[in-house]
Amino acid sequence: MFLGVGSTYNLKEELLSVYLSPFTFKSTYVLDEKLSNEGAFGVDPGSNARHELGILIRTKWDKELVTNMAMTNELELYSDYINNFGNIDVDWILTFKFKINNFLEANFRTHLIYDDDIKIRETNDQGEVETLGARVQLKQQLGIGILYSF
């Protein structure tokens, strides 16, 4: 969860917006007791919350690439002033929308996340933790929808 004071710049003809918040409060809450005891999502082990103060830059760009094909690019960058300033958390969503015909459309989305505070465990075949560190997380989605107008 983010709470901050900032300013937004919009370029309507390019469908581009840039939000800059030099004072942003970021909170991470882990309500699952097992996960909070493990220190998941960057919270201290046994704690349910983590709070940070930093800078947030958020951009969104919508673009029609060709007829019936559009792109949306959303990028969010955050850096904590107090802990490891300069380590940038990245949240990037890239979506392509395809209108196939009057009844069918498809979406392809990639979602990339990197947060230095989130440590991912890699285990060997015996279940022993071999490495613990920040990793790039990537999710891809393909959606196909049927359109119907009343």
Q: Where in this protein do the model-derived segments appear?
A:
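Outer-membrane beta-barrel "beta-signal"
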Residues: 136-150
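Surface-exposed extracellular loop regions of Gram-negative outer-membrane beta-barrel proteins
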Residues: 62-81
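Outer-membrane beta-barrel translocator domains and adjoining extracellular loop/strand segments
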Residues: 30-37, 84-89, 119-126
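Sequence/structural signature of outer-membrane beta-barrel proteins
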Residues: 26-30, 76-84, 113-119
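Solvent-exposed loop/turn segments connecting transmembrane beta-strands
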Residues: 51, 80-89, 136-137
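Residues on the lipid-exposed face of transmembrane beta-strands in outer-membrane beta-barrel proteins
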Residues: 3-9, 22-24, 55-63, 77, ...
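Repeated loop/turn-to-beta-strand initiation elements of outer-membrane beta-barrel proteins
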Residues: 14-18, 68-71, 103-108
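Outer-membrane pore/translocation modules
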Residues: 1-54, 128-137
